[in-house]
A protein has these predicted regions:
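Substrate-binding/active-site clefts of carbohydrate-active enzymes
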Residues: 27, 33-39, 47-259, 263-264, ...
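Active-site neighborhood of divalent metal-dependent phosphoester/pyrophosphate hydrolases
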Residues: 382-389
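Protein kinase-like catalytic domain
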Residues: 45, 149, 466-469
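Active-site-proximal helices and loops of the catalytic beta/alpha 8
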Residues: 24-25, 255-374, 378, 394-396, ...
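Gram-negative bacterial Sec-dependent N-terminal signal peptides
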Residues: 2-21
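Structural recognition of the beta-strand scaffold that forms the well-ordered cores
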Residues: 40-45, 95-101, 122, 127-130, ...
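Short clusters of hydrophobic/aromatic residues that line enzyme substrate/ligand-binding pockets
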Residues: 128, 178, 202-205, 390, ...
Length: 559
């Protein structure tokens, strides 16, 4: 079997259809059960998404002396909430938002070899019990979570168990009983991946130790100055009494991370730098976070989005779906992270697999997910915040990018601006800073040109696929089967707890005239089906359906 070369053909087709299709109506979403295996997770850098409160832009005396794209730029919690209220995420079919850490970051700056950098990204913690003033207040965070839940959107926090922030003149090193400051990791085996620092000047928590430790003096002094020392100590005493855990570094961290869940109703964690810690600690964290979410839901029944348990996804750098449940740390040591409390793994595969034909990718992913990984899932992406090899670095294939990401089996991670072709290269920036430009709201509003296309038209395509995906768990969670190669057509079928869902998708269709599409027995003759791409309906006849419109994609379901 030889599939047609869809990439170039669809690029031309989308170019011809974009302006017209942006105006086509889409059907209203139909309620179907949410499943994390089909989630569309919008991943954003809090500081780079939207500035909803300019009054917090100059926190802690941080200066405007950073290297290009390495300082704070104003994005905050209030900015995310504003976009939820506008309906931006709902229109895109997003049902979960993963935001970078908003806890208090180091106040100073450091240079890791790519220029002076501040902790705008959120991965350089100073105090795990407080929000960073540049990101917002607890009232603003509560409003964010409540607003998200009211709009059917879950909130995923990014958590770091591996390291503190770098040491700077303003930010002291944690005590030696808490962290190691060397050696630097060499990644040859488990020991040289875990018992080491990721880079120089990034103190590594002693997460493998069970030795009781006292609170770091700098936190004690800080909490006393802020008038909350007694409260924090009382809560810690209660935690250690309830759990029976030793007062070791990792258990303090677990308590602090779980507190955000218990207080605000956070729905899940994305775990950072997982392979650099002892695998077993994540199961312990999952237990505490699950208890915390259950407590919050009991206390806030009217605010609970559903009764699903706490969800955790793992970032094991360079994990690919083909690794399934066996990741090689080197030296003959393998780890099954899905046996350590995780429900899903971030897969680094699609950003390179997207260069392959659709059917090769879709069938391979489906086979693995419904075979070796049954009961778990992956979170696919085509670009991300620290991956220097995105699928489409120059944003020349925005429509194919959407198709490959949003139609691939598994959950989908939209990295902020994928849907608006946000640039991933900035003059003067070095390293991963290029991937972290500010969200291009101005280009979306003006419908600016991006190569052969316009930004608003690109987003309209992403939104059509996203809404279809959100309404149909079969897209990401269902079993894949090809129906035909010309045009490329496939079906996805899903069933869980007595609820079923079936869809048919066709890609690379002619934009000159309507095309008859085989539905592969998914829908019976005489059934009325809807194309979610155009909003048109048609009746199945002789196992095929023809919509009275010409669009490059058909997203077919019986609703």
């Amino acid at each position: 079997m030889k599939l047609p070369v869809l990439a170039s053909a669809m690029l031309l087709a989308f170019g011809a259809m974009a302006s017209a299709s942006a105006q086509l109506p889409g059907p209203a979403p139909v309620a179907k059960p949410f499943v994390w295996e089909n989630a569309t997770v919008y991943f954003l850098l809090t500081d780079r998404f939207n500035n909803g409160n300019p009054a917090n832009d100059k926190a802690y005396g941080r200066k405007d002396d950073a290297a290009p794209l390495r300082g704070f730029m104003g994005g905050d919690i209030a900015g995310i909430t504003a976009k939820i209220k506008e309906g931006y995420f709902t229109d895109l079919g997003v049902n979960a938002i993963w935001l970078t850490p908003v806890i208090e970051q180091i106040h100073g700056a450091t240079d890791e070899g790519t220029g002076k950098s501040y902790a705008f990204h959120g991965y350089w913690a100073k105090d795990f019990t407080a929000l960073d003033a540049a990101f917002g207040t607890e009232d603003e965070l509560r409003t964010l979570v409540d607003t998200a839940h009211a709009n059917g959107i879950r909130i995923v926090f990014d958590v770091v168990m591996n390291h503190t922030g770098p040491v700077t003149p303003q930010d002291k090193v944690w005590p030696a009983s808490w962290v190691r400051t060397g050696p630097t990791c060499t990644y040859k085996d488990a020991r040289t991946t875990v018992d080491c620092t990721l880079v120089a000047n990034l103190p590594d928590f002693l997460t493998g130790s069970d030795k009781p430790v006292d609170l770091p003096p700098h936190l004690v002094a800080k909490w006393k100055k802020e008038g909350r020392y007694e409260r924090e100590v009382k809560e810690l005493d209660a935690f250690f009494k309830r759990t029976g855990y030793p007062r070791a570094p990792r258990y303090y961290l677990m308590k602090w991370h779980a507190d955000w869940v218990r207080k605000f109703g956070i729905d899940g964690f994305r775990a950072d730098t997982v392979k650099h810690t002892e695998p077993g600690l994540w199961k312990e964290l999952k237990k505490e976070a699950s208890l915390a979410l259950a407590d919050w839901k009991r206390a806030n029944p009217a605010k609970s989005i559903d009764q699903k348990p706490f969800w955790m996804v793992s970032e094991v750098y360079n994990y690919e779906i083909k690794h399934a449940r066996k990741f090689d740390l080197g030296g003959g040591e393998f780890v099954d992270y899905l046996d350590q409390g995780f429900d899903s793994m971030i897969s680094f595969s699609l950003r390179s697999d997207a260069k392959r034909p659709y059917e090769q990718v879709f069938s391979e992913y489906s086979t693995i997910l419904h075979g070796e990984m049954k009961g778990f899932s992956v979170l696919n992406y085509i670009s991300s915040h620290d991956d220097s090899s995105p699928f489409d670095p120059l944003r020349q294939q925005p429509f194919e990018s959407a198709n490959k990401l949003l139609l691939a089996p598994g959950a989908a991670q939209i990295y902020y601006g994928d849907e608006t072709a946000r640039i991933l290269k900035f003059d003067g920036a070095e390293g991963d800073a290029n991937l972290r430009t500010f969200m291009n709201w101005d280009e979306l509003a003006s419908n600016a040109e991006r190569g052969m296309h316009r930004v608003a038209d690109i987003r309209a395509h992403w939104a059509r696929l996203g809404r279809f995906r959100a309404a149909h768990p079969a897209v990401g969670a269902g079993k894949h089967q090809m129906i035909g190669s010309s045009p490329y057509t496939f079906k996805r079928t899903w069933e869980q707890n007595g609820v079923s869902d079936r869809v048919v998708v066709a890609l690379g269709l002619s934009t000159q005239q309507p095309v008859a599409i085989s539905v592969g027995g998914v829908f019976s003759d005489g059934a009325t089906v809807r194309d979610w791409y155009t909003g048109k309906t048609a009746v199945v006849k002789d196992g095929k359906v023809r919509f009275e419109t010409a669009a490059p994609v058909a997203l077919i379901a019986q609703d």
